[in-house]
Amino acid sequence: MSVQVAAPGGLGLGLERPSPEELVRQTRQVVKGLEALRAEHRGLAGHLAEALAAQGPAAGLELLEEKQQVVSHSLEAIELGLGEAQVLLALSAHVGALEAEKQRLRAQARRLAQENAWLREELEETQRRLRASEEAVAQLEEEKSHLEFLGQLRQYDPPAESQQPESPPRRDSLASLFPSEEEERRGPEAVGAAAAQQGGYEIPARLRTLHNLVIQYAGQGRYEVAVPLCRQALEDLERSSGHCHPDVATMLNILALVYRDQNKYKEATDLLHDALQIREQTLGPEHPAVAATLNNLAVLYGKRGRYREAEPLCQRALEIREKVLGADHPDVAKQLNNLALLCQNQGKFEEVERHYARALSIYEALGGPHDPNVAKTKNNLASAYLKQNKYQQAEELYKEILHREALPAPLGAPNTGTTSDTQQQTLSRSSSFSKLRESIRRGSEKLVSRLRGEGAAGAAGMKRAMSLSMLNTDGSRAPENQFPRQHLSEASRTLSTSTQDLGPR
């Protein structure tokens, strides 16, 4: 007797392949059926065993034994099917566990891949910062070498210049272009009244004492005294002469410059606008004093970073000075320098080169190649070339500056020293200029390759040009004029009426 259990649901008919879950469910049903069938067969086997024990030797004994053997075989088949079903269920559970583990490992692999991508990005960022740090270190080393070179050049500065405090490095400053116009126009003997006379208008004698006191207090940093003094004088002038008077405009200009030194740029701007309006009404729109006020206002806007507003003011001041003084006047060249620097801060390098070239031609035509303003303007133009990555043009200008300073002074140059002093200085310069040329060449190449025209490099380049321009100056003249020049330079630097020290602090 053979017992077979058919799988429910038409298993094995080849209609469709069941899913693993369906196979497990059907296998569990088959297991339940086999267990019930096993219990039934065990009951039959028990009854047959009892019947065989109760009957003796008889004719039906063989039939009972045959039945018992069939039931035993059926039980063995049922046990085998149950064992295989249990194995199948265990295998299914194991496969499920493996699938879950597989999904877990896949999720972990995705997470590790994401972490790997993050680590790669972080590594790339770290490498980028490392390269930037290495470049910064290299740039700082080049700047250090350049500053050490500039420090070596200071030994050639005259005593009066070396005693003046160094201003901190700053961005391109409009004040670095040239000193006060009145100081250069009338010389040291008249600098005490530098801001007193503006564009042909002379301050009355009663205001000069007050003006000098304001200069003195402002130079000492005693603004709490200088400001009330200016305001009191301004009120007295308005009561006696009215608001629209040139004296009032002059006092407004002085008060504006005091506010400027206190970094009160808004108040200074308002006062300069008022002074400009008064001067235009009383002196005319094309008076040199109007040009000076326009220039002061433009420089003040430049200190506040408002270069676009400062440019038309500076342009108008240039037009006035060209019309009144002529196109080849030194003040026109100074105004061109200011306008070029404003354009440079706006990235208008074509206009910068044009303005500097024109200023350079004016200085060379008036003072020749040995004019200190030629070196300053060439240095400014070289700085503009550096900002445009025009390294070759910048290097040529720097070499021209050094070559001019290395040449002996022309025959017409003033010389108040003795012959022995002159010969000694000439020998000293000739023995050191070969080293200076080599040092400045290395410094310029490093400057070209790394500094790329930063503000500090521009200021340092200006100081270098100024230092080198003093190499041909007779040292015997320094002690005589040391104190007056320093005192008057401080006064004019504090309260200039045109362009002095209006750069960012």
Swiss-Prot record:
Residues 416-434 have a biased composition (Low complexity). GO terms for molecular function: kinesin binding. GO terms for cellular component: cytoplasm; kinesin complex; microtubule; mitochondrion. It is found in: Cytoplasm, Cytoskeleton; Mitochondrion. Residues 435-453 have a biased composition (Basic and acidic residues). InterPro entries: Kinesin_light, TPR-like_helical_dom_sf, TPR_rpt. Keywords: Coiled coil, Cytoplasm, Cytoskeleton, Differentiation, Microtubule, Mitochondrion, Motor protein, Phosphoprotein, Repeat, Spermatogenesis, TPR repeat. PROSITE patterns: TPR, TPR_REGION. Residues 1-20, 157-193, 409-505 are annotated as: Disordered. The modification Phosphoserine is found at S173, S467. Residues 489-505 have a biased composition (Polar residues). Residues 88-150 form a coiled coil. The heptad repeat (HR) motif is sufficient for interaction with kinesin heavy (KHL) chains and ODF1. The TPR region is involved in mitochondrial binding. Belongs to the kinesin light chain family. This is Kinesin light chain 3. It comes from Bos taurus.
